Amino acid sequence: MRFMFIVKSAHQGSPTPELLEAMHKLANREIKAGRMLDSGGLMPLATGAQVRITDGQLSVVDGPFVEAKEVIGGYAIFELQGKEEAVASATEFMQLHKDFMPGWEGTCELRAFAGP
């Protein structure tokens, strides 16, 4: 079963070097095991844009976005046995944040892909 992990946080700073190293080790392990298919960190909101439809009209809004309370900082795509394994993987990933970036608060949202 394919899952996307979406990491959200109100924290706007970069990960610590220690957290980056720990995430790199975890990612390498998961890639070698064939579970992690893709992953990436995202640039700050100021570099992005939103294309919206409001009242039937298209508009483009350049970042940063004032209304953003939580920002998607990164994602990963996994091939796992099911939700239980996905929760265990996400818990391990979030534990790295707790261990190597004290005070950081955020969420790792797990979403299964529709279809094969």
Go through each PLM region and give its residues.
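Conserved, structured core segments of small domains
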Residues: 1-116
